[in-house]
Amino acid sequence: MGGQCAPTAGDRYTPRSEADVSDPIPILELPHRQARALLRGGAPVFLSIDPVEYHGPHLSLRNDHLVSTGLSRRFHAALCEARVGQPWPFLLASTLDAGVDPTQGPGSRAVAFRELCGLVVRACEALADLGAERVVLMTFHGAPLHSIALQRGVDALLARGVRALAPLNLLLVDVATSPPEPFAPALAHVPEPERAPMLAALRHDFHAGFMETSFALALAPSSVDPIHRTLPDCPPITPDARLLRLARAADRVGKADVAAELRVVAHGVGWSKLRPFPGYTAQPRHATAEAGEVFVRYAVSRAVPLILDVFAGAPPPPPPMAWMEQLTLGGRMPGLDIPLEVVADLAP
């Protein structure tokens, strides 16, 4: 029969050195008593939910997980800086290797929307049962239904009195709707006349291109194949005409953010129809770790104040493109079809 152990002073987290603060602690691999003791101090748990997904020939199938974990480390470090003298341990929950609407290609695994909703909610409720008081749901997968599924987990945690958020929601909105000028330093090394059009089109660089490859070079460099330097640019994308018409209609009624989201989706649909299908957007050849650091610093500057606000009681940001759930009949409509035989073989 199990029994309860009264918490002692030794149960509280006391780092042996400054380096200990950044050492990841896989909370679900600790003895149960120790895991609960660590959570009693209110330290946030980072839960990564990312697909196994094709990212072209130059990135790994778990690239989203690797970037999520790297960002979790940077977010945690910034949170500790904000809590001078009161560091939190870096608590990681086991990753859910699952995602809705992954880019199709060799090795990709698709999970249905409703199935992922169930997986996320059960994982979050289990963390609440364990004693988590704060949870950060991390992902680097921007599919709208994926973000909505993560929000189901956020809502389940909030209902249990746990403060929680998915910070990528804010970053996705930034990329889709905000001017790209804050990212200009990431393109300082790109010669003109390429630089200006690259910056203007950055919001449409949504998969395994210059931006994501730079993130990976900054956060998980050993996972990036140098072939990215010689890959041909993604061919020009013809956005879906019907979605562009909807975007113009949204603009006319004053829904500028919805219009911007519809344009991103229109480019995504057009990208999926490229034949052969490259598996990446934009120009991975220009990606560098230095550019990745620009993107990482921006992510930290936007996400960490938000995390602190939510931990203090503010509401978390909603998922972008929440209308996608209704548009797809709750995820029942099939996603984009990219047969394996049309995926470009760009590896030598």
Q: Residue ranges of each PLM-predicted region?
A:
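Extended, histidine- and acidic-residue-enriched regions that form the cofactor-binding/catalytic faces
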Residues: G10-R134, F140-P348
